[in-house]
Amino acid sequence: MTPREAIRLLQSEIVQVVGCTEPAAIAYAFRTLVRHLPRKPDPRSFRAELRISQDAFRNASTAVVPHLKTRGILAAAAAGLASRADSFNVFADFDLRRARTFMKNSAWLKIVPVPRRGLFVHVQLPGLRTGITLEGRHDHVEKLVLFGEDRTPREKPLPKPPTLGEVFKLARKRDPQLEALALDFITRQVPAEKGFSLESQIARRISGRMSG
């Protein structure tokens, strides 16, 4: 694996997001879908069905949606419908009042847990032949159908994950761009602790996670 391939692979995995990823995936599915509709959904008439894997259902049901400060799938979907973001970071910018309007009446959303593991989110708009499926990665659009037309974005295949031997080779190369990406990610993930070097902070974080 080359440093360029490693950077591309890492960049596909490092996605900035406010809040937990399962609710964000639900919101992202709704946001992506309604962006392609000819007009904004009307809270009085909009209807949707959400089919979601057991793992995602469990995690999204207990996570709090930022700004709304409310747990659950309905809040995530409502935030997605009210989001102004075009990226996976859907909770970073949304119309709070509009989201609360969708939350007042839960009848518009039918939630169907399905016996699947991992990440699977499918949103269907009844009667419109319009739907979206996220699967695998939280931001990966597996299928997008708009009024019966397949509009699935075509992504360039990612490199295969490196073997342990390739990881060591990459580390020995000390590629400046790869190291800059890693440092940026680490410093975002590790909170500053006075009196400890960055290396010590990283070790403390790893130790804490490994010990639960």
Regions of interest found by a model, annotated:
Residues 23-39:
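Alpha-helical support elements that line or immediately flank enzyme active sites
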Residues 5-18, 181-185:
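Generic N-terminal amphipathic, Lys/Arg-enriched alpha-helix
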Residues 104-212:
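Signature of multi-pass transmembrane helix bundles
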Residues 1-5, 21-28, 68-72, 76, ...:
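Conserved active-site and cofactor/substrate-binding residues in soluble primary-metabolism enzymes
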Residues 2, 40-44, 70, 112-117, ...:
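Solvent-exposed alpha-helices and their adjacent loops that cap or buttress functional pockets
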Residues 11, 15, 34-42, 82-87, ...:
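Generic secondary-structure signature for well-ordered alpha-helical cores
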Residues 45-90, 100-102, 106:
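A structural-propensity feature for long, helix-poor, extended segments
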Residues 1-7, 43-56, 210-212:
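Acidic-glycine-rich active-site phosphate/pyrophosphate-binding loop
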